[in-house]
């Protein structure tokens, strides 16, 4: 593809090589006036078997500005478990890491965990457990960890479906002062006729 309306000519070359069924190699080049400014290359694979699907993308991105970015993306989807991962690095320096897991292997409950990490910006961890009588969620977020204004936010919430009660706590400076917190304890009723949840 060419874009002649620009002061420079921009070309995109994209090749998909079929290695085998559901396995490919991707090569993409962006060229400006015969000079390569971006190159993307790597395998893409997918596997489907036994009510489960997996796919994996492993790309290397290089540019005229120097350095390589490694992008790894993987996912697994099944009735029992779901996982989603992104891992990006500049050379050996981490840029972005995301890992989300939902586990349904225990018939009595569902668990979920998530990690989101942007170095020097935020590292956040979330968790949840859901069963027939209780929904428990928690979080642990560390913001600007390498700076003087670093702050950790921690908290949890319990929704007791059997007793119709809610309990929650949020610490907004958990790293330095455990007394800086908000607490909530309340009960609720469900009015099915009005389709409302009433907080007491």
What are these regions (language model features)?
Residues 1-200:
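Beta-strand-dominated lipid-handling architectures at cellular/organellar boundaries
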């Amino acid at each position: 593809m060419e874009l002649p309306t620009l002061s420079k000519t921009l070309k995109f070359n994209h090749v998909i090589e079929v290695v085998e069924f559901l396995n490919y190699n991707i090569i993409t080049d962006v060229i400006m006036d015969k000079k390569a400014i971006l190159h993307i290359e790597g395998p893409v694979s997918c596997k489907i078997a036994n009510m489960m699907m997996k796919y994996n993308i492993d790309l290397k991105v290089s540019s005229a500005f120097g350095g390589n970015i490694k992008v790894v993306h993987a996912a697994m989807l099944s009735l029992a478990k779901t996982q989603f991962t992104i891992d990006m690095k500049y050379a050996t320096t981490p840029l972005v890491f995301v890992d989300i897991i939902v586990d349904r292997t225990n018939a009595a409950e569902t668990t979920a965990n998530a990690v989101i990490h942007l170095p020097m910006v935020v590292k956040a961890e979330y968790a949840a457990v859901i069963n027939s009588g209780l929904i428990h969620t928690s979080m642990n977020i560390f913001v600007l960890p390498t700076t003087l204004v670093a702050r950790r936010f921690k908290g949890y919430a319990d929704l007791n479906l059997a007793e119709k009660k809610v309990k929650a706590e949020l610490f907004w400076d958990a790293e330095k002062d455990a007394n800086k917190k908000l607490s909530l304890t309340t009960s609720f009723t469900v009015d099915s006729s009005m389709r409302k949840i009433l907080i007491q």
